[in-house]
Amino acid sequence: MGGLDVVRAAHLHPSYELVDWKRVGQNKLVALVRSALVRVKFQDTTSSDSNNQDTSQNALSFDTQESQKALNGSQSGSSDTSGSNSQDFASYILIFQAAPRATWVFERKIKLALPYVKQESQGSDDQGSNGKGSLYTTLQDLLVEQPVTPYTPNAGLARVNGVAQDTVHFGSGQESSWNSQRSQKGLKTTPLPMPSPALSSIRAARTGSWMKVDRCMNPWIRPRRGRGRMRALGKIRKKQRRKMMPRWWGWLEVVRLEVLLVYKAMARTVRG
């Protein structure tokens, strides 16, 4: 799938081009596209002509006026489905689903907050992501903006492996960068919601009750008395069920077993 096919499948403006792509598993393809009409304008704070703009803010800004002129001059008769009439040339993360016959079907697109500007001096890789490309940094910024909650991506996987969410994304020994990057962007720390029992405990197959992970005993390491906490709870539940059942229930079970044995014996004689 080429860059032009990716843009056409997502119904974007022809000015969009493929910047980076990454394959996730066997059934997902994630691509990063940006518009070639986006220009970066540098505002000199020492000059007298400041175009009536606030010079105390960032010196770099996105010049959408020149982009709009180019759009109206060259693509005046084309249909616009990406919302470019509102001078919005934001970048998108496109997600594709694998289909039969080695094809990819467009699934959805995620709009980024700021347009992506290609930095030629750093030699960004346009053919694919090698772990240091633009798509990697963009996805990392998106993960930084998310608070650490049980509902964030890979949260359950991190708890199963016994590590924290920030360690999964930033590596061991770099957990402090999570809070520092959030503070630089002015993001507030969202309080954690009440965790469900499925995140911190497991459910017994026989008893159906929730049990804390640290209280579960390893089935291979058997204690002296009994075979672990799980089997002990199973015996307790079985005794409780016997107390709740009427007395004639046991006799009914014996009759059922006898009928089953007679049926099996008759089947054997018929086969013989």
From Swiss-Prot:
Coiled coil: none annotated. Residues 65-84, 171-196 are annotated as: Disordered. It comes from the Bacteria. Residues 72-84 have a biased composition (Low complexity). Residues 173-187 have a biased composition (Polar residues). Belongs to the MgpC family. This is Putative MgpC-like protein MPN_366. It comes from Mycoplasma pneumoniae (strain ATCC 29342 / M129 / Subtype 1).
